[in-house]
């Protein structure tokens, strides 16, 4: 085991799976793995765990997402000053945790850029989101050179890296939908480690992609407002319709280059032109649609601090 800070690893999940085993296998003696579930009826809730692992029952969310509620509970329970937030939907190698934590010790908050991979309708959605996020970073966001957006599925940071406090972070988590966006407001100077990767498999059915896109866009809209981006991409889509051949060539090359730069599958670039045309519709969904499903719950999001859990087990 490497010499590094004792770390609390927070893993929201309702069952004991391969990721739990992977993380437990690489814990140092003073680390802890907190497996965060929702209710006592979850499969993992009454499981006997090995040394260094505790199951924490966060309870049903109220006014926030289930994941945000679980992470808030985990931050309150954590006994160390360095934290890792991660998800259970991708595999990681034996050196993954050490690299993430030591990177955060040397360079400050550290994250990675995930590859959301899937078939079906996701092949159209992925290049649309890539174009949106790339242009947003260039034109709309105010980040320093080299600063990355912290992805809640893989991020390491120290208590002192927070601009406010753990209590303030927990308070915001308990009234929000997106743990990523909440962490982004509390954690500045995050860097991306290009040698860390995560491939997350995404369901490609029309229904699954619809709810995923609404969740992404609605969270962005209630935090920052999507109207300026809707105007921009509507104009771009009209130009692309008027000049289809050059627009298709430019979009395909741009998306292919962006994917190649982060070692992701470049085949998705062939859908760049149709993705460009539907992007205004995707953005408009985030402005207009308030309800969506996520991991067994239906949510209604009216504002950044107005999150209602409508139903579970949908």
What would you call each of these model-derived segments?
Residues 13-30, 43:
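Short, well-formed alpha-helical segments that are part of the catalytic scaffolds
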Residues 71, 80-91:
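Short beta-strand-to-loop acidic/aromatic patch adjacent to the donor-nucleotide binding site
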